[in-house]
């Protein structure tokens, strides 16, 4: 009888491993690992989660978590009820959950993850990686579904054809955040495709630095933003995520000032005054922006001056090689700066005390975008507004004269009259559209794999001789789990950043080279393909997240479009004329930019009124509550977890003994 019971329990735990919802990775090297495992298993099993413990990597243990079906139905019903009351879900029939088959993969994982990691004040377990009392937890992640990933990788090109079913399947598997990103990528690709025709017309039929071409690009940018907002609203309404941010769970790191009762849901919600968050953000961000901005501007300016000197003034040996030094040195100097900046930015964002993970990521991405903005556009601004108009003045007087008096006076400084390089701005712009994008593309794909390879083969040599014998029925799943645990976590910032920066290159500098949209179109296709590859092969499966927009990236699109209405006409003014700029040129360019900027606001108002975003009708809260009260839903009672409560603890002890045995052998 005992043998049959043990066999049945092993079968149940194998089912948990092979059909788990989440994997919790625990640091096996920690002295408090056993206490963490015991507390974790006890908390999970008391909350209707089935668990199984298995050896992970050389230094970590896996806790496989699967939610009980009856409890999942209850979680889904409660979540959909809240969504209906807040307006995110508009169909009352969808509130009812008859079986687990009514719950797609992304909703299932999101509900389980929110229940486990959410704050205890919001009726969750408060199990957060790296936070006490679960500091030994390394990460919590779901497993990829190989069948879906293989199919997605095979038919990725359907995203380029605007296939809505493909987006719906992505939403069902990865959640609305990922689906909305690919929807935006596809929409941007379509927009750039349209702009490419205007670029061809401008290149072959309009004169260089044409005002007409600049006006066309400005119109395209404004229409693109509004059309995307319309499309975005349609998708979020279709996926029932409108106004879903009001339901977002608080992070465990959030420190509320008080608690307030939610009038709709009737639950206590943690509260922290928005004005205090703004004050904290201002105090933290202003010094960061000023100091980092000055340092970065100084580095870019020095690299720019040295580049002009070596490429256009220096006439010594190995000029073709020496002229490449500024770019190499600049990259070397900015790498540590970027690393330090990202660490400081993340710590300052934590001090802002953001309530939700979405708010935290939005604030952090704002800090990072400032740095990417300067790295991407400052060189073009310097060439457009400093080198082009004034190089014939400051290069002979400040570079040639002073350098000729230094150790370069042996004849390496050209003494002939300096001539402005008319192709410098165009060449720099084409570099950012081609070489820089190729480097970025290779970096996105190659660097993570290189890091994983180095860690696996050189940096993480086994320090223990682990003797692990996996159960045959679990071998495939455990192999996948160990492989995916080594992957990096998905960061949506870099995905949006590439497209938004590309948008900026188009709407701010297109008159420099009208064929730029064609290069951007090729980059779009490559980025979409690389995104699919990274999702399926290179990163951990992201925990599904509900979002109702791509904010704050839509605001950055508007910012770049507004700046473009200043830069494009002023660049056309400086470079369309063959006469040299006069003393009043900068003033005239500023006036042109100011007038264009005012026209941009009028244009945005006009487009918004002609192509408005359809407002979703929300029934009053009391009416929604009344509708729910009239409707009766049959929810099955939550039964006990069908596994022995001692099985997981026994597995934890057995797994820990494997690591302890290996540790003892190593010390002998």
UniProtKB/Swiss-Prot annotation:
Gene Ontology annotations of biological process type: chloride transmembrane transport; endoplasmic reticulum-plasma membrane tethering
Subcellular location: Membrane
Chief location category: membrane
Pfam family membership, one: Anoctamin
GO terms for MF: chloride channel activity
Any GO CC annotation of this UniProt entry: cortical endoplasmic reticulum
Key word Magnesium present: no
Membrane topology category: Multi-pass membrane protein
Superkingdom of origin organism: Eukaryota
Keywords: Membrane, Transmembrane, Transmembrane helix
Keyword Hydrolase among record annotations: no
Signal peptide positions (record): none
Annotated InterPro entries: Anoctamin (IPR007632), Anoctamin_N_fung (IPR049456), Anoctamin_TM (IPR049452)
Residues passing through the membrane, by range: 182-202, 208-228, 286-306, 321-341, 379-399, 430-450, 499-519, 557-577, 587-607
Protein name, UniProt field: Uncharacterized protein C691.05c
Organism: Schizosaccharomyces pombe (strain 972 / ATCC 24843)
């Amino acid at each position: 009888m005992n043998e049959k019971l043990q066999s049945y329990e092993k079968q149940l735990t194998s089912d948990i491993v092979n059909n788990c919802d989440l994997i919790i990775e625990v640091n096996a090297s920690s002295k408090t690992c056993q206490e963490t495992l015991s507390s974790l298993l006890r908390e999970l099993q008391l909350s209707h989660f089935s668990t199984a413990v298995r050896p992970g990597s050389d230094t970590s243990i896996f806790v496989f978590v699967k939610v009980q079906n009856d409890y999942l139905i209850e979680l889904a019903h409660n979540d959909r009820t809240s969504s209906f009351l807040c307006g995110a879900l508009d169909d009352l029939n969808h509130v009812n959950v008859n079986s687990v088959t009514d719950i797609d993969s992304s909703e299932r994982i999101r509900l389980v993850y929110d229940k486990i990691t959410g704050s205890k004040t919001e009726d969750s377990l408060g199990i957060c990686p790296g936070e006490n009392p679960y500091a030994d937890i390394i990460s919590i992640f779901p497993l990829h579904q190989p069948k879906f990933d293989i199919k997605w990788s095979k038919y990725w090109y359907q995203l380029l054809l605007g296939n809505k079913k493909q987006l719906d399947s992505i939403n069902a598997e990865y959640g609305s955040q990922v689906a909305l990103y690919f929807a935006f990528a596809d929409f941007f690709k379509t927009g750039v495709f349209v702009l490419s025709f205007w670029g061809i017309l401008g290149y072959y039929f309009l004169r260089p630095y044409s005002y007409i071409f600049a006006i066309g690009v400005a119109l395209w940018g404004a229409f693109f933003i509004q059309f995307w907002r319309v499309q975005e609203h349609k998708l979020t309404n279709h996926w029932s995520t409108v106004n879903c941010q009001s339901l977002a769970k608080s992070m465990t790191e959030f420190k509320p000032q008080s608690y307030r009762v939610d009038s709709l849901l009737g639950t206590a919600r943690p509260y922290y005054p928005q004005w205090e968050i703004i004050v904290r953000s201002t105090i933290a961000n202003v010094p960061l922006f000023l100091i980092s901005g000055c340092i970065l501007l100084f580095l870019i300016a020095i690299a720019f001056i040295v580049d002009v000197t070596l490429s256009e003034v220096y006439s010594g040996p190995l000029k073709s090689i020496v002229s490449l030094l500024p770019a190499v040195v600049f990259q070397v100097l900015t790498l540590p700066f970027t690393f330090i900046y990202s660490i400081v930015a993340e710590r300052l964002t934590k001090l802002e005390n953001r309530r939700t993970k979405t708010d935290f990521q939005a604030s952090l991405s704002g800090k990072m975008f400032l740095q990417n903005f300067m790295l991407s556009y400052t060189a073009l601004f310097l060439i457009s507004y400093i080198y082009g108009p004034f190089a014939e003045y400051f290069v002979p007087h400040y570079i040639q004269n002073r350098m000729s008096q230094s150790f370069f006076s042996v004849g390496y400084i050209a003494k002939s009259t300096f001539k402005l390089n008319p192709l410098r701005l165009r060449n720099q712009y084409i570099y950012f559209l081609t070489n820089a994008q190729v480097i970025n593309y290779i970096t996105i794909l190659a660097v993570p794999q290189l890091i994983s390879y180095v860690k696996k083969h050189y940096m993480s040599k086994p320090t223990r001789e682990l003797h692990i014998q996996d159960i045959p029925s679990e071998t495939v799943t455990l192999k996948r789990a160990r492989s995916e645990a080594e992957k990096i976590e998905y960061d949506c910032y870099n995905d949006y950043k590439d497209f938004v920066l590309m948008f900026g290159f188009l709407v701010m500098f297109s008159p420099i080279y009208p064929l730029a949209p064609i290069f951007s179109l090729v980059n779009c296709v490559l980025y979409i393909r690389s995104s699919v590859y990274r999702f399926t092969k290179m990163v951990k499966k992201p925990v599904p997240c509900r979002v109702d927009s791509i904010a704050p990236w839509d605001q950055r699109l508007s910012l770049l479009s507004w700046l473009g209405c200043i830069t494009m006409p002023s660049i056309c003014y400086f470079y369309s004329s063959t006469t040299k700029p006069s003393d009043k040129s900068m003033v005239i360019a500023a006036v042109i930019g100011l007038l264009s900027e005012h026209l941009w606001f009028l244009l945005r108002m006009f487009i918004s009124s002609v192509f408005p975003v359809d407002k979703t009708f929300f029934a009053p809260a009391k009416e929604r509550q009344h509708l729910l009260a009239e409707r009766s839903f049959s929810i099955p009672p939550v039964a006990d977890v069908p596994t022995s409560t001692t099985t997981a603890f026994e597995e934890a002890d057995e797994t820990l003994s494997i690591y302890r045995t290996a540790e003892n052998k190593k010390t002998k």
